[in-house]
């Protein structure tokens, strides 16, 4: 028979507004008629018909306790089972609180420890307002703190004293407890019993401190046998084959490093004892992917490095070719300058050679004259006269010789002696200064017969631009100057020399040294003595 929760619960004293609001929710509609899993599904048989009834689960007890007329072990609501109690998952016994109301939050406590706090009420969801005057949140006063501290100290001292006393080999006698007075009233109230009530003084019996212990409390009690192991289902035994025997064969332990007995063990036995062949080596495929990725990255890096190196070599080759071109151009320019300088040097060398030959000839002549003058003085005078002779003059036949140096005698115009006219003859004006009335030998002279180059001789070389070239060039300035001195301006005054800066201060050092040498009393006395001697 099934019961509804509404029939079991008592009538509510006051309707809760929050509960009424929840029940008005459409989710609760039509759920009151559904059977609840928390209700008891069956009831115990009525009294007098429980001969063969054995209560096993919580549902057999209903909402009551144990049945004293049934002499079997009964655990109503799991009482007495402790940790071994077993609760069904879908069945839960009804529990009532101190106020007589059914505890519906028992469903939320399934699977949790009994001491765990489970918030299953609507008030637990709301924020709790604390009052400052509430006793639950007030700090304890000083008296309460002192009392708690004293109780804690006494408890700790008791524990420590008991530990110390148990460790001592001989203990002193325990202090006896104070006597207790008990009022005793006998159960038989008759005249033979004497007084109706009596006072009994109860005193603790004194113990002998040297008495050995009566009971062995240090003996270890064996544990109870544990629960039997769970049964393991085995397959039927089979006959061992040779392959199974070889698989289960464990080789002896043979060391790869030590052989104190000196046994000769085969290499296959050592490898079998090593156990390396029993392990299956599994190589991850990511290693191959990593190796391929590294190889591709290395190849690309090498290609990039090679490309960069080729580009650098090409740039270096271009720079080298440009530098070689510049050097070749500079070398060609230097060769041209050197060839020009060599031509100038050759011309200068030719002039120098000519001058050296002239100088050498003159030295030979001087040496010859000196030798002749030393040996034959008369011949030296004759040679001296010949040296003064003008051999460069052109001798023209039919013309008078006007060179007085050649004859050594002065020549006069004989026609002057035949005329009587002079300065006072009135042949010329007073303003004119011309002692001669006509040019002497003006018709023909030696200078007219001297060769002079004609003006138009270089027309075939320079053309008609010779006059322009002469006008553009300065007659008294060289066409080409020295390198580095062409832009210098001509100074108006004498030559001025520039004084270099004294970087190391040598001039000041020399002046200071000279002043030191000149200074002193001895120097002044010597100077005065010299002046006195000069005077």
Curated annotation (Swiss-Prot):
- Give me any GO biological process, just one: molting cycle
The name of this protein is Uncharacterized protein T27F2.1
Ranges of Basic and acidic residues composition bias in the record: 22-34, 376-393, 511-535
Superkingdom classification of source? Eukaryota
Q: Which GO terms describe its cellular component?
A: spliceosomal complex
Which family does this protein fall into? Belongs to the SNW family.
Region (SNW) residue spans? 179-342
| Record region (Disordered) | 1-58, 211-254, 313-353, 376-416, 421-440, 508-535
């Amino acid at each position: 028979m099934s019961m509804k929760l509404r029939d079991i619960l008592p009538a509510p004293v006051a309707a809760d507004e929050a509960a009424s609001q929840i029940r008005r929710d459409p989710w609760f509609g039509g759920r009151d008629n559904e059977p609840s899993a928390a209700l008891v599904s069956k009831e115990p048989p009525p009294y007098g018909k429980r001969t063969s009834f054995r209560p096993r689960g919580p549902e057999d007890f209903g909402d009551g306790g144990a049945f004293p007329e049934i002499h079997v072990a009964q655990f109503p609501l799991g009482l007495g089972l402790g940790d071994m109690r077993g609760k069904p998952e879908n069945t839960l016994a009804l529990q009532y609180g101190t106020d007589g109301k059914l505890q519906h939050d028992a469903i939320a406590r399934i699977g949790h420890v009994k001491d765990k706090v489970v918030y299953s009420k609507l008030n637990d969801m709301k924020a709790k307002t604390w009052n400052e005057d509430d006793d639950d949140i007030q700090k304890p006063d000083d008296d309460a703190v002192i009392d708690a501290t004293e109780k804690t100290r006494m408890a700790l001292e008791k524990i420590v004293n008991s530990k110390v006393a148990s460790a001592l080999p001989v203990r002193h006698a325990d202090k006896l407890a104070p006597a207790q007075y008990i009022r005793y009233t006998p159960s038989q109230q008759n005249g033979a019993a004497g007084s109706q009530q009596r006072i009994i003084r109860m005193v603790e019996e004194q113990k002998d401190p040297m008495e050995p212990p009566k009971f062995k409390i240090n003996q270890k009690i064996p544990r109870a046998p544990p629960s039997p192991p769970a049964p393991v289902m085995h397959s039927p035994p089979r006959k061992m084959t040779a392959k199974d025997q070889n698989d289960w064969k464990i080789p002896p332990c043979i060391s790869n490093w030590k052989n104190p007995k000196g046994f000769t063990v085969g290499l296959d036995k050592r490898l079998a004892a090593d156990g390396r062949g029993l392990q299956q080596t599994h190589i991850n495929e990511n290693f191959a992917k990593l190796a391929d990725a590294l190889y591709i990255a290395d190849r690309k890096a090498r290609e990039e490095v090679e490309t960069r190196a080729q580009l650098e070599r090409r740039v270096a080759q271009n720079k080298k070719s440009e530098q070689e071109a510049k050097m070749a151009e500079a070398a060609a320019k230097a060769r041209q300058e050197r060839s020009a300088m060599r031509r100038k040097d050759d011309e200068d060398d030719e002039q120098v050679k000519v001058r050296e030959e002239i100088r050498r000839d003159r030295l030979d002549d001087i040496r010859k004259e000196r030798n002749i003058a030393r040996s034959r003085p008369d011949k030296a005078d004759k040679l001296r006269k010949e040296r003064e002779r003008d051999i460069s003059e052109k001798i023209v036949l039919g013309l008078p010789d006007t060179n007085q140096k050649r004859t050594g005698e002065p020549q006069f115009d004989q026609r002057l002696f035949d005329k009587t006219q002079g300065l006072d003859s009135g042949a010329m004006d007073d303003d004119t200064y011309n002692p001669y009335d006509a040019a002497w030998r003006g018709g023909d002279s030696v200078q007219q017969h001297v060769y002079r180059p004609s003006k138009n001789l270089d027309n075939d070389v320079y053309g008609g631009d010779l006059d322009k070239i002469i006008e553009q060039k300065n007659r008294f300035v060289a066409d080409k100057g020295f390198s580095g001195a062409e832009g210098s301006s001509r100074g108006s005054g004498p030559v001025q020399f520039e004084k270099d800066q004294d970087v190391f201060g040598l001039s000041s050092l020399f002046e200071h040294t000279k002043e030191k040498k000149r200074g002193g009393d001895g120097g002044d006395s010597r100077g005065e003595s010299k002046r006195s001697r000069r005077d």
